[in-house]
Amino acid sequence: MKIILSGGGTGGHIYPALALAEVIRKHEPDTEFLYVGSERGVESNIVPATGMPFEKLTVQGFKRSFSLENIKTVSLFLKAVKEAKKIIKDFDPDVVVGTGGYVSGAVVYAAQRLHIPTVIHEQNSVAGVTNKFLSRGATKIGVAFDAALSQFPKDKVFVVGNPRAQQVASIKSNFSWQQIGLSDEKPSLLIFGGSQGAPPINLAVIDAMQEFNKRNYQVVIVTGPKRYENVLDRLTTQPADNVRILPYIENMPEVLAKTSAIVSRAGATSIAEITALGIPSILVPSPYVTGDHQTKNAQSLVDAGAALMITEPALSGKALLLAADSLLLNESVSKTMTEQAKNVGIRDAGDRLYALILDAIGE
């Protein structure tokens, strides 16, 4: 089998595609993959590092307001579609899978024009612009959230989850909190605002530090590499022995597997990882995303009893501390939330999406 994967712009579009490839290789080791991404996107570094063949296209996103730049965007898109057609004809895939981002729009649309089966995957509860555009011509559509079902043609959309969940759930963790000077016997709260960090979360942590120092649970704060020194400079109370402040964590899935509770943004990949592992969570959605989709992602977990949510305007040291205490000092609440998170998580998401791809090829 030969498959073209395309998704770009953010890790939330890229990692599900790579996780899917990992699952498919377990079922069909001889599968050939080609990843088509954008020239300037992070996928141009992430994908080649995995050893997967990679082709580049030049695309850019639309401006939300009227702009002459949108004329250039359309021109680049049409050129990218033409280039994508050549790539597709040369590779001759059985199916083309798009996981979102503007580059996948050009690639999947080109495949549709060439009458090649296409599958798109929507990771968020609010469908992205690209996937909405592609949905009419797609052979099959997989979504991660029930809330996304109504946004696509009902005869070809199915809930499959996020392949990243299956990848994380299968990891055997060798991590020990002792590696950073903490105990494996105490509950541990991980506060993580994403790979670049989240200033509002960092500020709330600074505000809560004096009280965190007094708790009998452990607190690990990941600031983001560029924000680490700033956080240390702004502390008025130094961390106690139960608190660690780190710029980043390289082996995040292994650390997550040993985490008692987490404070996190509500991006699709984070949600997939949290639910796959059944981690009680305090979600702080970013309000600076398209369609406010992180709030809707978070609300789906809150409605299921799998998470707490603090909106960014309501975030403070006190609010963060109260939420953390409610999870880490109340075993029954934590246990219930763990069970509900696992119920929400789809731990065989990669297998489900693979089955959908086979259905698309068979049509």
Curated annotation (Swiss-Prot):
Q: Which CDD domains match?
A: GT28_MurG
Protein name according to UniProt: UDP-N-acetylglucosamine--N-acetylmuramyl-(pentapeptide) pyrophosphoryl-undecaprenol N-acetylglucosamine transferase
Q: What is its main location?
A: membrane
Keywords from the UniProt entry: Cell cycle, Cell division, Cell membrane, Cell shape, Cell wall biogenesis/degradation, Glycosyltransferase, Membrane, Peptidoglycan synthesis, Transferase
Q: Where in the cell is it found?
A: Cell membrane
**GO BP terms in the entry:** carbohydrate metabolic process; cell division; cell wall organization; lipid glycosylation; peptidoglycan biosynthetic process; regulation of cell shape
Q: What is its EC number?
A: 2.4.1.227
* Gene behind this protein: murG
GO function terms (MF aspect): undecaprenyldiphospho-muramoylpentapeptide beta-N-acetylglucosaminyltransferase activity
